[in-house]
Amino acid sequence: MMAMSEAQRADPDVLIVGAGPGGLASAMLLAHSGLDVLVVEKCAEVGGRTKIIEQDGFRFDRGPTFFHYPEIIEEIFQAIGLDAHKELGLIPLDPSYKLV
């Protein structure tokens, strides 16, 4: 995250508690609209339930391994002038499942 001035830390326009996907998306949109946003997170890393835990050479997803609605992520990034696929490295699963 970007470093902020002491004034921004002391008096942000918006305080967001939690740096999971929802908190980060909200922060992106609000900051893009010109507000000073401060995100606070209790953990050392951002990501919330989308973090990965590594233990004994194995990787475990703490949250989703795929998003059912990637278009929502794409809309959020488009709203701030970025491409979600370039920024996040999203990989389409085609098909991820079939309804029969």
Question: Model-found features: residue ranges?
Answer:
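A short, basic/flexible loop-to-alpha-helix module at the beginning of a structural domain
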Residues: 1-12
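N-terminal Rossmann-like FAD-binding beta1-loop-alpha1 element of flavoenzymes
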Residues: 12-39
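A secondary-structure boundary/capping signal
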Residues: 17-20, 42, 63, 69
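Glycine-rich FAD pyrophosphate-binding loop
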Residues: 31-56
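N-terminal FAD cofactor-binding segment of flavoenzymes
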Residues: 53-54, 60-96
